[in-house]
Amino acid sequence: MTHRGFARAFLLATALGLSAGHAATTSPGTIYWDQYAVPHIYGPDIPTVVRGLGYAQMENHAESLLNNVARARGRSAEYFGPGTSNFNVNYDMQVRTYGIPARAQAWVAQGGAFQLSVLQAFCDGVNEYATRNPSQILPGLQAILPVVPSDITSGEMNTINWTFLPEQDDVPATIAAWQAGGIPAVKKLKRVRKPEGSNGWGIGPAKSADGNAILMGNPHLPWGNNQPISDSDADQNFGVYQWIEANLVIGNPNSPTLNASGVTFIGGPFIGVGFNDYLGWTHTNNTIQNADLYQLTLDSTGTKYLFGGVYLPLQHTTSVMKVLQPNGSEQLQSIDIYNSIHGPVVAFNAAKTQALALRVAGLNEPSLVTQYWNMIQSQTLPQFKAAESALQMPFFNTIYADRGGNIFYLFGGQQPVRPANLTAADVFNTVLDGTNPALLWTKTMTFAQLPQAVNPPGNFVANSNNPPWTTALPQPSTLDPANYPTYIAPSFMDFRPQHGTTFLSSATAPLTTAQVLTGKMSNEMYLADRVVGDLITLATAAGKTGDTTAAAAAAILTAWDHTADATSAGGPLFEAWWNLVVADVQAGKISADTSDSFYSPHPKFRVPWSASAPITTPSGLDPSNNAQLLVDLDAAYTQTAAAFGSASVVWGGAHKTTLVTRSGATQQLVFPFLSDLPLSGADDPFGPIRVVNPYYVGALGQFVSYGGDGYVQLIEFTPNGAQGSTLLTYGNASRPNSPHITDQLPFFQSETLKPALRTFSAVQAAAVSVEGF
């Protein structure tokens, strides 16, 4: 995307079939575009800046936004055809099975007048851009216009309720296992769950060098459509995760009533992670189980299910989809949709004697947009908590800091109220008995019942997708698991949260923002710190008995600094070894750890994880696995040497920072990549703070990056307002060949951030173009 002089003439709405009949009441506004394509949107009121946000999102992400709309409508096959391997058809069937389009319209009606004004203003901005710039809307996307308020609520529901929640709770893998072998296969399922999660730190004044609260927010998600691993039809559906950074300023530009900055998902009419001059917040994925699968027992006709000793009829409806054909015609396809009292039926067994129904939280909470605008406008912790107490967001931890020196943590979302005798082991990673009414949750906890902490004694809160119990150490009583039902969350602390908590708790002097940034950018592999010593001892001993490969591996690992810095040698060998070990744990060749394995399987440790020593355990390798651990090390040495020319290859020789551009209505991947730079940063299981998710491409002989460290905000709340810096690794645009896909990479590569522009004078000085809307 380049800003092209911006035609001022308003073209007739009929050019693209747009209607202004339901336009929101707004005033003229102005967008100041900075050099990184961040829109600084000025207007007199909320509807005006929201209209500008819709306009700006189209300017930066028109193809991605309209693709997201098409999918959330359940009509992508109608617009784009069946897709590779029938992807679009299957996706639309899923959206319709979930009932997203109809419920999205209900949310519009139920959400109240304020929310409707925001939704309509955003749509007006989207449609205004399309009307002004018809040549910038690809022919294959024009039929999707105009965008209407229910498109925004359907996108919200599709992304949060029906994508985030099921993926976090491992629903897709569980369904696949059940279809292959029923409940026994589910119980045997060896899970490899990576927390598509984040880092969030709130640092109180006592730990801050300037005596001001500091907030570090760092969501870890796929890099939207700017990542390289999907080569057709955006089949990975990563566009739903694409951030856009924006600055919304209301009132007098020099003394605004609101000056809010941050990011939102494409299609979002609010700031989802961000800050104003008084406070800020970030989110991390929490260990909440609120997307549950229930096994239904069907009668002989397959049309009724057993519930509480009585057979109830499955609700049956049909939906007719249009599927675009290569010759331009449309083929109609009818699908059957079934619902039980639990939720939509998502799978049947082959004999149609059993089925799975999926129940997700938050479907009766229509006012997410209102909640986030209340959060954005808050100036104090009580105001912010009052806004969040609406619990319209079914998910996420919240980490918060403010100008008054407060820090706050909330285990947020819609937490089901379950029978008191259930434990986390009973409800996580399983299929519930759909015949038992006691297991069907109908209520969720109130805000006051959720784990939370305000200004804990350690003067920090830190969450990296760990359960709430270890988010503040020393542990305050409000985060003591003994005070909550045992089914809320398991007890564990993986290596990345240990890394962050150790950094914050071990600081011997108050931290500057520069020191916080250094900690946030750490590529140290905490996993390696715990196990490499035992591995070297094992390999050295084997070398003395003639295993020259083990001896060579030991030499590399001994010299390694345990980081994933681009110039560090040894990390790729350790990575290859660990991946083989995890595969052997899954295959039963290596005995598994049971103390700290919620996200990813671990081999048995010599010292297991302990809640009494949460940031120093687990450690070591259990000797019972030594033989296979050594086999895997020899294999890893051979594999690494074959793949990269040397087993001592540096991290950046094996791993590259890769961003791409896409073309066409369905956003086909374009070669060559826009970037191919030596990377610093490892995958989550290894325990770095700076996470980058790798994907090995054999044809390239390297790992490419597809997610992880995306948005970063580091904000200090001074008496004069918020000051700090931000970064969006994969850029603030996704339009074909946009220069703003890669223009923030120099910051990412150098592990720095760009300044957050917080005053009108700074915005004016940095503006490369100015646009009225």
PLM ranges: what are they?
Residues 1-5:
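N-terminal secretory signal peptides that target proteins for export/translocation
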Residues 8-19:
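Bacterial N-terminal signal peptides
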Residues 25-239, 245-256, 260-270:
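Substrate-recognition/specificity elements adjacent to catalytic centers across diverse enzyme folds
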Residues 39, 43, 48-96, 279-330, ...:
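Gly/Pro-rich active-site capping loops and adjacent beta-alpha segments
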Residues 115-227, 235, 391, 403-420, ...:
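Acidic, low-complexity N-terminal propeptides/linkers enriched in Ser/Thr/Asp/Gly that mediate export
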Residues 248-258, 263, 274-432:
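Glycine- and hydrophobic-rich flexible loops that cap the catalytic core of alpha/beta enzyme folds
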Residues 269, 354, 393-507, 581-585, ...:
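Hydrophobic alpha-helical segments
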Residues 300, 365-396, 403-404, 480-534:
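Proteins synthesized as precursors that undergo proteolytic processing into mature forms
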